[in-house]
């Protein structure tokens, strides 16, 4: 039997799994989960409030934005996808490599920028999502054969 989880519980659990610990915040990284922090406080032009964020000061690095819902919500609903995409749009003003995660405690959809991609069926540590942008090596021998 699936146990109902409030959005607060889902957000807190997701923050722990992803490793979005506020104590890791530094001069080179904005990181955390919450419901009070606005994008404006994170250096963007919006009063919207993300559920979770990983925002390196190096804008060439991968940024992660988390949108959580309670466990009864269908994360494939267009309104939730649009909410995540709106948050991706906000941070895309500074970052070109963005992972957007939509999560309800049981189901997960992951977007590389705004493209839905196949990933692990359970939420992973942030490094897993950062690695989605690693360059694939080119096999020159295969190309020229």
Predicted features, each with a name:
Residues 1-99, 107-144:
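A short, conserved, highly charged catalytic patch centered on acidic carboxylates
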